[in-house]
Amino acid sequence: MPRIVNPLDEMLFKEVLKEQQRIRVYVERARYGKLKTIIEGIDEKEFDLEDIAKKLKAKLACGGTAKNGRIELQGDHRDRVKKLLAELGFSEELIEVE
């Protein structure tokens, strides 16, 4: 018999997970000396990285992708990413910006 899950319990569980994620935001050099912002530490099994990347790209007006368990954004967006992730429900105290 399949386990019946209350949708409200599942939503609360996801909110608690969001608040416990340790997220690291840093910049890497890409091709031709360009910069890219890397966001690591979001559990890709529990959260849709593609959806989070899509929201961040729209807010930051930049290109990017979600691959290998991390989000890559074109350009240096470290200063704004922390605030935007907090707006999406992630704990601001657990977001480390380098």
From Swiss-Prot:
Which BP terms from GO are recorded? formation of translation preinitiation complex; regulation of translation; translation reinitiation
InterPro entries, per database record: DENR/SUI1_TIF (IPR050318), SUI1 (IPR001950), SUI1_arc (IPR022851), SUI1_arc_bac (IPR005872), SUI1_dom_sf (IPR036877)
GO MF annotation terms: translation initiation factor activity
Q: List keywords of the entry alphabetically.
A: Protein biosynthesis, Translation regulation
HAMAP family from the entry? SUI1
What family is this? Answer: Belongs to the SUI1 family.
| Protein known as | Protein translation factor SUI1 homolog
